[in-house]
Every structure is written in C-alpha cells, then in structure tokens.
C-alpha cells in the first residue's frame, strides 16, 4: 500500500475546531476586557507576576489570557514550565498532593525572575479539602512556582487562596465584539453568510465567544450557508421571531394568538427554561412602550424564578401570557 503523505502543520490546523484554530496567542488578539488584559501585560513586562485569579462567565477568554501571559513570561520553556489542569475533572485532594506538588518540586532552568506556572481551569469546582491543600502548596513553593486560577465565581474559592492572589474580573463580551470576531473568522474560512445569519449566532452566543465560534462552525459544516434559518436549526433554540410575535400579541391584549405560539413552542419540545430565558432576551430589545416593557420584564422575571425553583409546567408560561395581557390592558 502506498504510504500516506505526511500532514503539514496547515493540514493539521484545518482539522482543528475553530475555537482552537482561532485561539489568541498574543494579548493584542484577545477580544474585550481591555483594562484587565492591560494589567496582565504590565505583569508580563515586569516579569515577576503574582498568583492570579481570573473570574468571569464562560467563553470570554480567561484561560486563553493566562496562556498568553505564560507564553510571554516563559517563551520556549512554556512546555516544561507550565502545568495545565482542568479542576472540574481533577478536583480532589490527590491531584494537589500528587500532580501539582510533584510539578512544583521539579527543577526547571528558567531566566532570572521567572517562575513555573500552574494553570487551574474551573478552579471553583475543586473540593474545599483540595483548596486547603493547594493553599499550603502555594505557600511552600512560592519562590519557584506561580498559580493562575480561572473560575466562573470567585466566591467558591476559599478566602486564604483569594488573599494570596491578585483578583481580576472578566465581563461578558458585547454583541458587537462577538459579531466582529465572527465576521473575521467567516472571511478567513471563505463562508457565505447573511447579516441575519451572523446576528442569529450572536443572539445564541449571549456574549460567549466559544459558543459563538462553535455555532458558526456547526452551521457552516451542517448547511454551508450561514443564514438565520440554518443557525436556529443547528442551535435548536426557540426562534426569536416567534417570541417577538408572541410578545406583540400580549402587548395588543390578544391572549389567544399569543397562546397559539406558546403551544407551538411547547409542542416542539423546548424546555420551559429555554423558552423563558429567550422571552426575556427578546423582550429587552423589542420595540414597545418603555413603561409597558418594564412591566413585562418584571412579570417575566417572577415567572423565571418560579421555573428555576422547579415549577416548570406549561401552566406557568400560560399564566405569564395572561399577566402580560393584563399589564398591557392597564397601559
């Protein structure tokens, strides 16, 4: 049999998921959170970075930013001087005692003022016992090793670890920032896209760049063309156009037409959480009287709370439509 030709680096990159293919490797490539990234670039130029906790929602570049910092500080020594762990998989005390401690004890030749780096992703998933053990390890090996923790909520990190770290917070990316990156990637990949298609991806991403790129790739590979219709087929969320129509019917005090749309969404198998979350997002941007919109948002919030508490029947959503119609009647 003829030998398979050796794959070039470009061939390998073409088969990568786009979230890896377009992952930033320099600070200037990171989208959003400019002030926080600027603080980290100061650490990079000074060389002696402290222990760091970066807290923020998923898909905003927390781990990527830490990796960029490690690359600048360590250069060619990155592979042997960086330990990356996902704490949600390896959350027990044994990981700290074995993997992290052994890595901290290893001798690696680095330039003066540089340290080995332990990157802990989803650190808020670690058990309290593991965090206590980590605190001790951070203390003992502070002269040779720095720790960078990424988490969604810093409240779940124990106080002794928080007090040993510089706390940085990332916020959700704006729709404009996500859209700009999607356009850039679509041009690189030579995709056929419509404005509505990209806006649909931005709507489903909710400020999460990772989600946005995954949805873009899934739509491109599933259908080829990036249109709103194709995006919602892939992402399978309640269509915002239907929800917008439903809210307008409520604003016009027409509960029968509004309920028809709700019943259709329920029949399609969407969960109450999906329906209520998207009703809220659509209501925020819909063009209706401002005072009425505030009343609607209040009622949607109360129903959302009930659904999260577990009362997630069609009856709750139907009651919401009735309350929205009553609110509209008063205006």
Swiss-Prot record:
Entry's Gene Ontology cellular component terms: DNA replication factor C complex; Elg1 RFC-like complex; nucleus
Which cysteines are cross-linked by disulfides? none
Query: Sorted alphabetically, which SMART domains does this protein's record hold?
Result: AAA
Pfam families cross-referenced by the UniProt entry: AAA (PF00004), Rep_fac_C (PF08542)
Q: Assembly state and interactors?
A: Heteropentamer of subunits of 140/145, 40, 38, 37, and 36.5 kDa that forms a complex with PCNA in the presence of ATP.
Classify the main location: nucleus
- Alphabetically list the UniProt keywords: ATP-binding, Cell cycle, DNA replication, DNA-binding, Nucleotide-binding, Nucleus
The family database entries (InterPro entries) matched by this protein are listed as:
AAA+_ATPase, ATPase_AAA_core, DNA_pol3_clamp-load_cplx_C, DNA_Rep/Repair_Clamp_Loader, P-loop_NTPase, Rep_factorC_C, RFC_lid
Task: Give the disruption phenotype, in one or two sentences.
Answer: Defects in mitotic chromosome cohesion and condensation due to aberrant checkpoint control in response to DNA replication inhibition or damage to chromosomes; premature chromosome condensation and precocious sister chromatid separation figures.
Q: Record the organism.
A: Drosophila melanogaster (Fruit fly)
Alphabetically, the GO molecular function entries are: ATP binding; ATP hydrolysis activity; DNA binding
Q: What is this protein called?
A: Replication factor C subunit 2
Alphabetical list of NCBIfam families matching this protein: PRK00440.1
Entries under CDD domains matching the protein = AAA, HLD_clamp_RFC
Task: State where ATP binds.
Answer: 56-63
A Gene Ontology biological process noted in the UniProt record is:
sister chromatid cohesion
Q: Does the keyword DNA-binding apply?
A: yes
Q: Does the keyword Heme apply?
A: no
UniProt-annotated location(s): Nucleus
Q: What does this protein do?
A: The elongation of primed DNA templates by DNA polymerase delta and epsilon requires the action of the accessory proteins proliferating cell nuclear antigen (PCNA) and activator 1. Subunit 2 binds ATP.
The family this protein is said to belong to: Belongs to the activator 1 small subunits family.
